């Protein structure tokens, strides 16, 4: 049975392979650490921005999967550092001979699987952010006025912090505030004629104005911020509603958050792809180094050539061997007679 992808490794190539694996393993550990930082940062961002995502959004699964993949990649890199360093010293390598094989299997199945899952999520989930942000922001703006309603008391504070931090206003622009009641009914005077007319003129009984909250104001603007009666050209003679308003944030929060979260997901996906490549190289190199050293009894500087390989035989032969071994293991052992006891003899009847 011929081995799969054999590679002849003389003395110097074996040493260079071990040294190269030591460097690649450190790079893999570093990449795993960077993935941990990136996924942790994305988790923190989603903890603050989760209010503005739809409850059915699956995007938070991405940093969780990436966190697990980064931890496994970091562990695989550290194992590679230890194994490659020990392989250069015949006195340090024997403890690794029994555990390196199972570690390679675990790193290939667990680490590789997690990286593939994380990379797939990084490519698929950002596309669902558009609808999730749209639904979440509609709900957040609708509850802006509910400062005394249980479950929505923090909506105003969260929306104000969002608009001030990300320099945005409304969902797609400041005019989105014209279609929602953002002033709490507690601060409205039902006896005021203007208030009563606005409420009665709305089908849903909402108090709608052509104004925006204070958090939409741009503090860097040299002019006073215009918050009220923005659609009335007579109220502000120098303000043209058809021109961009320099006093208010120009972008909507939907566009800003979508770009921000997609950039974070893109960075995380790139790191997962690089880590997958590094982990594949490290695991392949460790496998060749392990099988080469097994042929030399674990001594890397032994004279002569040795052969490294991925599998000792083809897939068909491996399955056949495993089947035969399993059949032997499952076959019941023959019962043995106790020592000192002769098997009973059958009585022969006389003819």
Swiss-Prot record:
It is found in: Photoreceptor inner segment membrane; Photoreceptor outer segment membrane. Residues 45-64, 126-263 are lumenal. Residues 331-351 are annotated as: Disordered. Pfam families: Tetraspanin. Residues 1-19, 85-102, 287-351 are cytoplasmic. Retina photoreceptors (at protein level). In rim region of ROS disks. GO terms for cellular component: photoreceptor outer segment membrane; plasma membrane. GO terms for biological process: camera-type eye photoreceptor cell differentiation; cell adhesion; detection of light stimulus involved in visual perception; photoreceptor cell outer segment organization; protein heterooligomerization; protein homooligomerization; protein localization to photoreceptor outer segment; regulation of gene expression. Keywords: Cell adhesion, Cell projection, Disease variant, Disulfide bond, Membrane, Retinitis pigmentosa, Sensory transduction, Transmembrane, Transmembrane helix, Vision. PROSITE patterns: RDS_ROM1. GO terms for molecular function: protein homodimerization activity. Belongs to the PRPH2/ROM1 family. Homodimer; disulfide-linked. Forms a homotetramer. Forms a heterotetramer with PRPH2. Homotetramer and heterotetramer core complexes go on to form higher order complexes by formation of intermolecular disulfide bonds. Interacts with STX3. Interacts with SNAP25. Plays a role in rod outer segment (ROS) morphogenesis. May play a role with PRPH2 in the maintenance of the structure of ROS curved disks. Plays a role in the organization of the ROS and maintenance of ROS disk diameter. Involved in the maintenance of the retina outer nuclear layer. It is linked to Retinitis pigmentosa 7: A retinal dystrophy belonging to the group of pigmentary retinopathies. Retinitis pigmentosa is characterized by retinal pigment deposits visible on fundus examination and primary loss of rod photoreceptor cells followed by secondary loss of cone photoreceptors. Patients typically have night vision blindness and loss of midperipheral visual field. As their condition progresses, they lose their far peripheral visual field and eventually central vision as well. This is Rod outer segment membrane protein 1. The lineage of its organism: Eukaryota, Metazoa, Chordata, Craniata, Vertebrata.
């Amino acid at each position: 049975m011929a081995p799969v992808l054999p590679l002849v490794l003389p003395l110097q190539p074996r040493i260079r392979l071990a040294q190269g694996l030591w460097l690649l393993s450190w790079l893999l550990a570093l990449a795993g650490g960077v993935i941990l930082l990136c996924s942790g940062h994305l988790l923190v961002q989603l903890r603050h921005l989760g209010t503005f995502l739809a409850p059915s959004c699956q995007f938070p699964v991405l940093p969780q999967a990436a966190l697990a993949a980064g931890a496994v990649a970091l562990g695989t890199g550290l194992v590679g550092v230890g194994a490659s360093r020990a392989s250069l010293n015949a006195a340090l390598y024997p403890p690794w001979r029994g555990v390196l094989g199972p570690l390679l299997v675990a790193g290939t199945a667990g680490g590789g699987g997690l990286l593939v899952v994380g990379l797939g999520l990084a490519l698929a989930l950002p596309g669902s952010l558009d609808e999730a942000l749209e639904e979440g922001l509609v709900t957040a703006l609708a509850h802006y006025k509910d400062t005394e309603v249980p479950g929505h008391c923090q909506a105003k504070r969260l929306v104000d912090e969002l608009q001030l931090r990300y320099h945005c206003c409304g969902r797609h622009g400041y005019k989105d505030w014209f279609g929602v009641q953002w002033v709490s009914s507690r601060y409205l005077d039902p006896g005021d004629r203007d208030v009563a007319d606005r409420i009665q003129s709305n089908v849903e009984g909402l108090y709608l104005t052509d104004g925006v909250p204070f958090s939409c104001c741009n503090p860097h603007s040299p002019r006073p911020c215009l918050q009220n009666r923005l659609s009335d050209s007579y109220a502000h003679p120098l303000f043209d509603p058809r021109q961009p308003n320099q006093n208010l944030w120009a972008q909507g929060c939907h566009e800003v958050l979508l770009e921000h979260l997609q950039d974070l997901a893109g960075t995380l996906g790139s790191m997962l792809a690089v880590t997958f490549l590094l982990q594949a190289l490290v695991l392949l190199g460790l496998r060749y180094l392990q099988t080469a050293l097994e042929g030399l009894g674990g001594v890397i500087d032994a004279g002569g050539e040795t052969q490294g390989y991925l599998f000792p035989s083809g897939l068909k032969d491996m399955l056949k061997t495993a089947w035969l071994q399993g059949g032997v293991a499952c076959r019941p052992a023959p019962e043995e007679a106790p020592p000192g006891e002769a098997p009973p003899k059958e009585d022969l009847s006389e003819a």
